[in-house]
Regions:
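Compositionally biased intrinsically disordered regions enriched in Thr/Gly
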Residues: 1-228
Length: 228
């Protein structure tokens, strides 16, 4: 009997929390993450992964953002300056569901809490097994994946700099190699995307820097069931 593939529930995992300082709300957090809701071991593993992620994000908000939010509020009150309650929101976007593949990324955004920051994380799942797939799964064996993607990123960045469509730090070539992470990728209809954190290779105005390669025989490619 063929195993049923993981399917996302129409009701995602949703959590909200508010922190106060001196009885005044200074930080709110809202978390919306994917959920399967099934009873199989694969579904439970998937849901446990994102429950742990949600808890870790709320701990990050309390440990890192709350002190800054409280300080911002007290400073504004002392100066009689305008002030807004800080807000943190973590949400997800499904980028590809095709065959055995489920790919998505999450983004955490922080508002009214300088410096401006967006955090992205991505996961690509095998819907048959309920396990995460590594970046190397989408390239032929022994492919120098990092070298190939960094080279492609450098070429794209150079073209963008020449046409004035994007800005990078002067040493972007070295930074693209140094800040590369094999976990920072997702799949979409147009190919494989990999990305860099804010401020790591380009000014804040560029946000999260995203590069892509179309699917091809030399990789990246989508594996068929027989190739798993």
């Amino acid at each position: 009997m063929e195993r049923e593939l993981l399917r996302l529930s129409e009701t995602p995992l949703h959590l909200e929390k508010t922190w106060e300082s001196g009885g005044v709300p200074v930080l709110t957090a809202e978390v919306t993450l994917p959920c399967c809701g099934g009873k199989s071991r694969r579904a439970r593993r998937f849901d446990r992964y994102y429950r742990q992620y949600a808890r870790a994000y709320l701990k990050y908000c309390e440990a890192e953002l709350l002190p800054r939010a409280a300080e911002t509020m007290h400073t504004a009150l002392e100066r009689s300056a305008p002030w807004s309650c800080a807000r943190a929101a973590l949400a997800y976007r499904v980028t590809l569901v095709r065959g055995d593949i489920l790919s998505l990324y999450t983004e955490g955004r922080e508002e009214h809490l300088p410096p401006r920051l967006t955090l992205r994380r991505a996961e690509t799942w095998d819907r048959r097994t309920g396990f995460l797939l590594p970046l190397t799964a989408f390239f032929p064996p022994k492919t120098a994946v990092k070298k190939r993607l960094v080279r492609a990123a450098r070429e794209t960045a150079r073209e963008q700099m020449e046409t004035g469509t994007a800005a990078y730090y002067p040493n972007y070539g070295a930074l693209l190699r140094r800040a590369f992470s094999s976990r920072s990728f997702y799949l979409a209809d147009d190919g494989l995307h990999w990305f860099y954190p804010m401020y790591s290779v380009a000014p804040a105005a560029e946000g999260i820097v995203d590069f892509s390669l179309p699917y091809g025989e030399a990789g990246p490619f989508l594996l068929s069931e027989g190739e798993r």
